[in-house]
Amino acid sequence: MRDIVFIERDPYAPIRHCYTVSKILYQGKSPYQEIQVIESPEFGRMLILDGVVQLDEKYEFLYHEYLAHVPLHAHPNPRNVLIIGGGDGGTLREVLKHDIVERAVLVDIDKEVIEVSKKYLPTLSVGFQDPRAIVVNEDGYKYVQDYENEFDVIIVDSTDPVGFAHVLTTEDFFRHVYKALKEDGIFVAQTESIHYHLEMVSNIQQRLKKVFPIVDLYTSVIPIYAGYWWTFSIASKKYPVRTPAREVKVQTKIYDADMHEYAFLPESFYNKIVNGEYKY
């Protein structure tokens, strides 16, 4: 009997990943995208949107812990958090590990992703059961425009910033985010691969610098993502972000106070990336 193999065809990176599939758990289509959940003997369950792997059970913590805990620990009092995207629930789960968080609003345009994750990805979707979680099925770009001085931290956990997610990387969106944040708010977004999307990373950093006084870049190594070396762009109205502002008490697999600082690129290397001086 031949193995079933899933070949990821990421249109935004010149690379192909192949995964052995032991079982196809779900396959369907929402009004916005194709949704699949497969079981891999090496990576556990995997969520695939429009043919691109979004996460795997084995290594998802390398993404969700960094996306959530760096901004939340950089802020001394993050009580109200907005997550745009993240319908799988992984970022919400990590945010709600912080007892100080009183409200976590998750806005994802695709209700089907949330429902599929609740059924097939229980280790990620546990946060939806928390009474502090509020789920809104709307366009995150439009949602954020309705708020001013509302959130302590805003996290964008989107698919690749192209297609309907492209607006979440524009200067216009960043200005709406700035307005929706409180006077000491912090913003973070996943911003793709240093290896294959270097120009995009640099452009997003430049746009953020037009809006926020403090802008920085940190990374994590994520085996299932193109190029492995993944970036997160972070912006702050007030607080420096390279060191935690609070004691790290949350239970994690890898994130801690040391890893928080290690995640940030050396400033000399960071400046080369932002200024477009770093070339392969």
UniProtKB/Swiss-Prot annotation:
Single Gene Ontology MF annotation: spermidine synthase activity
CDD domains: AdoMet_MTases
HAMAP family in UniProt: Spermidine_synth (MF_00198)
Segments traversing the membrane: none
Subunit structure of this chain's protein: Homodimer or homotetramer.
Annotated source species: Aquifex aeolicus (strain VF5)
InterPro entries in the cross-refs: PABS (IPR030374), PABS_CS (IPR030373), SAM-dependent_MTases_sf (IPR029063), Spermi_synthase (IPR001045), Spermidine_synt_N (IPR035246), Spermidine_synt_N_sf (IPR037163)
Ligand binding (spermidine): 64, 88, 157-160
GO CC annotation terms, alphabetical: cytosol
Stated family: Belongs to the spermidine/spermine synthase family.
Predominant location category: cytoplasm
Name of the featured protein: Polyamine aminopropyltransferase 1
Catalytic activity from the UniProt record: S-adenosyl 3-(methylsulfanyl)propylamine + putrescine = S-methyl-5'-thioadenosine + spermidine + H(+)
Record function comment: Catalyzes the irreversible transfer of a propylamine group from the amino donor S-adenosylmethioninamine (decarboxy-AdoMet) to putrescine (1,4-diaminobutane) to yield spermidine.
Record: active site: 157 (proton acceptor)
E.C. no: 2.5.1.16
NCBIfam families per record: MFS_SpdSyn (NF037959), PRK00811.1 (NF002010), speE (TIGR00417)
A Pfam family annotated for this UniProt entry: Spermine_synth
Pathway participation: Amine and polyamine biosynthesis; spermidine biosynthesis; spermidine from putrescine: step 1/1
Sequence positions that bind S-methyl-5'-thioadenosine: 33, 108, 139-140
Chain's gene name: speE1
Domain PABS stretches: 3-237
Keywords annotated in UniProt: Cytoplasm, Polyamine biosynthesis, Spermidine biosynthesis, Transferase
GO process annotations (BP): spermidine biosynthetic process
Source organism phylogeny: Bacteria, Pseudomonadati, Aquificota, Aquificia, Aquificales
Location in the cell: Cytoplasm
